Amino acid sequence: MSLIETVPVNTEHKSVPVHLHSNLSGLSEEIAKLPGVTSVFLITEKSIHSIYSKYLERELSSLPIKTIYIKGGEKSKHINRTGEVYNQLIEYGADRKSLILAFGGGVVGDFAGFIASTYLRGIRFVQIPTTLLACVDSSVGGKVAVNADFGKNMIGSFYQPEFVFAPLSVLSTLPDREWKCGQAEIIKHSLLSGGEYWEKVKTHSFKDLNVDSTILPYLIAESVRFKANVVSSDEKETGLRKILNLGHTTAHAIESVTKYKKYSHGEAVAIGLVTALLLSEQHSELDPVTTKETIESLKNYGLPFQTKLKSKQLAKHMLHDKKNVGGSIRFVLLKSPGSPIFDIPINSEDIILAIHKQKGI
């Protein structure tokens, strides 16, 4: 049996198990537990499917499955791309008892989840993350969305999968950059969690990340457990769940300014974490030692901690962030590791000064 651990995400209306597996073995058994599935649709990227097709075919050979390909990259996760996928599902005869399998990274998971949440007013789906970033973040919690011309994840919903199946063996094919991107979210979760988790993250570096290491399952499980606890208490992001946006206000501005071409999401989050911590020093009395330790950890994992993008340009793009209220830019800040605060209004001048200070570190 390839099961390593199952972490439950308990929400008001549903309990979603997150299964951490060493490989794809056991996926078909989990699908078989779902009642009344009439057909299965795999939504994935061709580049991902070509690597794992033989393993998927072997594992899912007993299922009536059809594959729908989408293009890779954040640009493909656009509202304009949904129509062709809806049409394919209609053409293939997908009904309300059909099941969608989202096999890929965060883009595939977000896109396929959004399709599942809206097709026939909602059909079941399963998250099968193939990147470290998706394993610890986007596949867990039920957020699904697509992008609009003027913003990331502007059109979406909260829609829980039937389960998450994370096969760690697929991570072995990830390029170094993808490993590092996932680590940015792990660092974020450890800062929010504090305690032993934060201390553990600080003592490791990029060279420790591989599918055969003992630390990797620990880091993933702790991240999933932390996020599961947050989501369980606030599924719809009306309060506590907002803390998971630590670093993301700056990150989304960076991605938007560069049109998703220069920085990966994880790299943008890494830079955004430092911006948030510098603002935390000013607005929530964070000890500067935490900022220094975070920068050191980012370096150890090969992640950026500053950008050459213009401070004013980034601040301008933050005005369009979906977390804003009444035109006020809202940040998640940190009082100390394990003690985040959210919905903190920050004026553009302070943001510009923080990013400017960040450039000089």
Swiss-Prot record:
EC number: 4.2.3.4
Keyword Cytoplasm (UniProt): yes
Location(s), subcellular: Cytoplasm
Reactions mediated catalytically: 7-phospho-2-dehydro-3-deoxy-D-arabino-heptonate = 3-dehydroquinate + phosphate
Top-level taxon: Bacteria
Binding-site residues, Zn(2+): E185, H248, H265
Cofactor mode of binding and number, as noted: Binds 1 divalent metal cation per subunit. Can use either Co(2+) or Zn(2+).
Keyword Ribosomal protein tagged: no
Role played: Catalyzes the conversion of 3-deoxy-D-arabino-heptulosonate 7-phosphate (DAHP) to dehydroquinate (DHQ).
Official protein name in the record: 3-dehydroquinate synthase
Lineage: Bacteria, Pseudomonadati, Spirochaetota, Spirochaetia, Leptospirales
